[in-house]
Amino acid sequence: ENTYSINKLKELQKKYPNLNILVGATTYKLFNPNEKKTSTARKISNEDIFYDVYNSAIFINDSGYVDVYHKTKLVPGVEKMPFPKILDPLAKIAVNLGGTSGSLGSENYINSFLVNTSLVTPLICYESVHGDIGLGETNLLAIITNDGWWKNTAGYKQHLNYARLRAIEQRKSVVRSANTGISSIINSRGDVLQKSNWDEVVCMQANVSLSNTNTVYSQLGDYIGRVSVFIAIIFLIMTFVKVRLSK
């Protein structure tokens, strides 16, 4: 909480006393000598010191309290390598997504931030692609992403539309800060109320609705799709058996 970056953000809060800040960051954790190491722990060269790297969201409320959430859904091959002790050297040739590559540390579940009396749930980049991420109780979705690695392709546009899907599924408004992508304000129906151009420096101001509604999808997930697949498999088996018996 006393790092240079955190202190600079707190200095900004002194100018705007009611300001709550949510930003993306690359964070690190040093392991104590006797502490159990994770499978993603990295070793400092020529030192018996281990550390983990995280793709994180940092929240500082208007009282100066600092909370941190570490990304749960990591990008395969870039932020998450299978068999890390064997394949981690491949991280050097992995796609550059604008942050630290290789196997990152992660949390097991989404952590929401308390803003006054409302819960704001951060989604970091690739997490906003997942409809089954398990958001739990929340009033507002906040997406932090770096879309610059897509450059000027359809990728950053598709990523924006995934945010619209999350809004519709959860019936929650979405505020989206996309570094070099399209930042936007999206209502609970998936309508884009405000948006930046691609790769544009912009400041947005908006009143967003805070919803307590829990949709059937948010509670049950993709059960309709799973049931449909199961029924389709049953029909295929029945058809196969019928064809075999008719011969």
Please report, for each region that a protein language model flagged, where it lies by residue.
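Enzyme catalytic cores with a strong preference for nitrogen-chemistry domains
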Residues: E1-K247
